[in-house]
UniProtKB/Swiss-Prot annotation:
It comes from the Eukaryota. The keyword Protein transport does not apply. It is found in: Secreted; Nematocyst. One of its GO terms (molecular function) is toxin activity. Contains 5 disulfide bonds. This is U-actitoxin-Aer2a. It comes from Anemonia erythraea (Sea anemone). Keywords: Disulfide bond, Nematocyst, Secreted, Toxin. GO terms for cellular component: extracellular region; nematocyst.
C-alpha cells in the first residue's frame, strides 16, 4: 500500500518524511513510499514505475 509522506524538519529540503510502521524514511516530495506486500518488504520511494531508496531522517 501507498504510504503518505509529509514535510518534516527531520528531512532535507525537497524531501518529505514517510512513516511506514517502524520504518521512517525521507523521500523526494513528488513520490510516495511503499514497503511491498503487507508493508513488510523493502521500502522504496516510488513515482510511476521508477523507484529509489529513501534516505534516513536526521531526527
Amino acid at each position: 500500500g501507498e504510504i503518505e509522506c509529509s514535510s518534516s524538519e527531520c528531512c532535507p529540503s525537497g524531501k518529505h518524511l514517510c512513516k511506514g510502521g517502524f520504518v521512517h524514511y525521507c523521500c523526494p516530495n513528488d513520490r510516495y513510499m511503499s514497503c511491498g506486500i503487507l508493508g513488510f518488504g523493502t521500502c522504496y520511494c516510488w513515482k510511476a514505475d521508477y523507484y529509489e531508496y529513501g534516505s534516513t531522517p536526521t531526527c
